[in-house]
């Protein structure tokens, strides 16, 4: 899929857990996509090399079935090798312009902007397709992440890009984030720890409808 044929980044933006069992990772990711996730980001800090490539490849096949973009976290080389739909970059993960050169004009590039509107403006000027702010709330995934004031979302509207909120987002606080201007909510913990992952994904999805 090309960027132009993909839906915009919006709704539930699911980020994979650190799961080493590829079969289980695919199974739970399928549940999330069936529940209405608008995008899936492959992020696994417990695997690398061939295993990471195999996992991402399996998820890409899955996302193709659901016509949902697969975004690779932090790894432009892996995204290019798999022809994934895009990459998400943090401040230390490489240059947006270099990623665009490596991936081509049709891939999605997202940028972590933490609590910094100036960083978001810079990302937009370099060609990012969406910007992410967070942590919006205390996060078990990144407990030391800087906190982002949700007032940033309204200010970031000037960029004309989809805005993703991340960090400690649950069903209890997501509606306020959306009302503040987030186009998508990136969720890890509140999603994968659910007894019924598909139902939990659907609950998040319904907040946007």
Swiss-Prot record:
Cofactor comment: Binds 1 Mg(2+) ion per subunit.
EC number from the UniProt entry: 2.5.1.3
Enzyme class: transferase
Keywords associated with the record: Magnesium, Metal-binding, Thiamine biosynthesis, Transferase
Stored InterPro entries: Aldolase_TIM (IPR013785), ThiamineP_synth_sf (IPR036206), ThiamineP_synth_TenI (IPR022998), TMP_synthase (IPR034291)
Keyword Metal-binding among UniProt keywords: yes
CDD domains recorded: TMP_TenI
Positions contributing to 2-[(2R,5Z)-2-carboxy-4-methylthiazol-5(2H)-ylidene]ethyl phosphate binding: 139-141, 168
GO MF annotation terms: magnesium ion binding; thiamine-phosphate diphosphorylase activity
Cofactor(s) in the UniProt record: Mg(2+)
Catalysis performed (reactions): 2-[(2R,5Z)-2-carboxy-4-methylthiazol-5(2H)-ylidene]ethyl phosphate + 4-amino-2-methyl-5-(diphosphooxymethyl)pyrimidine + 2 H(+) = thiamine phosphate + CO2 + diphosphate; 2-(2-carboxy-4-methylthiazol-5-yl)ethyl phosphate + 4-amino-2-methyl-5-(diphosphooxymethyl)pyrimidine + 2 H(+) = thiamine phosphate + CO2 + diphosphate; 4-methyl-5-(2-phosphooxyethyl)-thiazole + 4-amino-2-methyl-5-(diphosphooxymethyl)pyrimidine + H(+) = thiamine phosphate + diphosphate
GO cellular component entries: cytoplasm
Similarity field: Belongs to the thiamine-phosphate synthase family.
Name of the protein: Thiamine-phosphate synthase
Organism: Methylobacillus flagellatus (strain ATCC 51484 / DSM 6875 / VKM B-1610 / KT)
Gene giving rise to this polypeptide: thiE
């Amino acid at each position: 899929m090309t960027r132009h044929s993909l839906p915009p980044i919006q709704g539930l933006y699911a980020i994979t857990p650190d799961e080493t069992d590829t079969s289980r990772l695919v199974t739970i990711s399928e549940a999330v996509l069936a529940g209405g996730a608008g995008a899936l980001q492959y992020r696994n800090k417990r695997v690398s090399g061939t295993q990471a490539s195999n996992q991402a490849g399996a998820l890409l096949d899955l996302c193709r079935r659901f016509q949902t973009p697969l975004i690779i976290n932090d790894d432009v080389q892996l995204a290019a090798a798999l022809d994934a739909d895009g990459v998400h970059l943090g401040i230390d993960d490489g240059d947006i312009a270099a990623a665009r050169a490596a991936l081509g004009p049709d891939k999605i590039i997202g940028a972590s902007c933490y609590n910094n509107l100036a960083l978001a403006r810079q990302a937009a000027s370099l060609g990012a397709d969406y910007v992410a702010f967070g942590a919006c709330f205390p996060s078990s995934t990144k407990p030391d992440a800087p906190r982002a004031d949700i007032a940033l979302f309204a200010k970031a509207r000037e960029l004309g890009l989809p805005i993703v909120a991340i960090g400690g987002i649950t069903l209890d606080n997501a509606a306020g984030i959306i009302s503040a201007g987030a186009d998508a909510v990136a969720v890890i913990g509140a999603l994968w720890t659910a007894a019924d992952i598909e139902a939990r994904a659907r609950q998040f999805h319904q907040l946007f409808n």
